[in-house]
């Protein structure tokens, strides 16, 4: 008869920033595809957490990019902005680590409200080793919110200048 074995494990720290009231995240993996802290990541990175989004009232991804060091925004039409870093256009944009194609006319996918995102991870510099082909500008990873263990409901409303208003649930 075989002896009894006990197996135990801890859940991987996913780096969820919602509800943490923190301006940093314990782990991010956009730069190396490994769950490393920002301090352990060997590239220039910025993480915009849910708390910072709420505190600074960053409603759109454009608002987030305006508050990110090293990112320049150029207008390429009405509601079609292009993000640039280090003199190059940022073409490397991912949702939860999966690449998306912005196509010829900008990024309609980038017009979404920030309510669905937990955090935005920006890696400045060449990310071709881990992201595939690209230019030496930056890589942007939009990390969506994850379901919680307990039921959770929130309703937020906002209003501002320039016909800026909305409601999220």
Model-derived regions: residue spans:
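Acidic, small-polar-rich N-terminal luminal/periplasmic segments of exported/outer-membrane proteins
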Residues: 3-150
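Short strand-turn segments of transmembrane beta-barrel domains in outer membranes
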Residues: 143-169
């Amino acid at each position: 008869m075989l002896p009894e074995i006990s197996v135990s494990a801890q859940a991987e720290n996913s780096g969820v920033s919602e509800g943490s009231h923190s301006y940093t995240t314990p782990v991010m993996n956009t730069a190396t595809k490994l769950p490393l802290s920002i301090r352990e990541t060997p590239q220039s990175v910025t993480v915009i957490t849910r708390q910072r989004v709420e505190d600074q009232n960053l409603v759109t991804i454009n608002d987030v990019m305006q508050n990110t060091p090293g990112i320049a925004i150029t207008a390429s039409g009405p509601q079609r902005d292009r993000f640039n870093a280090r003199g190059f256009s940022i073409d490397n944009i991912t949702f939860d680590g999966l690449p998306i194609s912005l196509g010829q006319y900008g990024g309609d996918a980038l017009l979404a409200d920030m309510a669905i995102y937990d955090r935005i991870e920006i890696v400045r510099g060449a990310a071709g080793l881990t992201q595939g082909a690209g230019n030496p500008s930056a890589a942007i990873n939009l990390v969506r919110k994850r379901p919680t263990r307990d039921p959770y409901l929130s309703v937020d409303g906002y209003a501002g200048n320039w016909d800026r208003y909305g409601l999220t649930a």
